[in-house]
Amino acid sequence: YNSSKILQNVNFEIAPSKLVTIVGPNGSGKSTLIKCIYRILAPQGGSILIDRKDVTKMTRMDMAKYLSYVPQSSVRIFPTNVFDTILMGRRPHIGWLGSERDEDKVWEVLRLLDIERLAMSNFSELSGGQQQKVLIARALVQEAEVMLLDEPTSNLDIWHQLDVMNIIRDVVKKKEITAIMALHDLNLASYYSDRIIMMKRGKIIAAGDPQSVITEENIAKVYRVEAAVRSLSDRPVIMPLRQIRGARA
């Protein structure tokens, strides 16, 4: 932002059909990275390759065939009913006029996410969890190879957090797409992710499977928190114990 560098030397590769989570403390660059990938923010340099194609050089319409984006649940941008909100996701394929096939695609994702009953409801009147499902559905009908999600569980209670994360994990498997999400909750990231990228002050500190990234050492280094990390069903579980005073944020 302005003259300050938010991201520095960020490089990573992701295998297809994986659920990847970007974690880190406030200000680490998680959401900025997601927004740079989707070109909401313009990076000063570098490239973003999907199937060896650089999306930074594509038109918005062409890019939308490769990348879809789910904003935070607190963003309320659609003054329409749920069906029409989701139909907007077909824009890269249909222009402004939809066909019967496009409407069938909408009904398909409504059924997939079990929200058919909400089809004619006003988007702005839905609960936070329902809105998040609709935004995920909108991204799915876009039929992009990579789905980006910015804090998909923010402002949701624990039941709806699990509901949304289960949907994302199931969609990655069923649709064979890649999901990249910024997330605050380390336990959710550990339980659901195939791969985790841990950031601090705009740099990648660790990247790999949950067992190699979610460690007591990394949590102390990145979050300045002493934590006990235990294994449950071969996944790390984090129990924060105390803050580490005096260390630099």
Residue map of PLM features:
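The feature captures the beta-strand-to-loop junction immediately N-terminal to the Walker
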Residues: 23-25
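Helix-to-loop junction immediately C-terminal to a conserved catalytic motif
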Residues: 38
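Conserved ABC transporter NBD signature motif
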Residues: 46-54, 63
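Conserved ABC ATPase "signature" region
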Residues: 87, 101-118, 143
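Conserved ABC ATPase signature
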Residues: 122-126, 130
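Catalytic Walker B motif of ABC-type/P-loop ATPase nucleotide-binding domains
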Residues: 147-151
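ABC ATPase nucleotide-binding domains
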Residues: 222-249
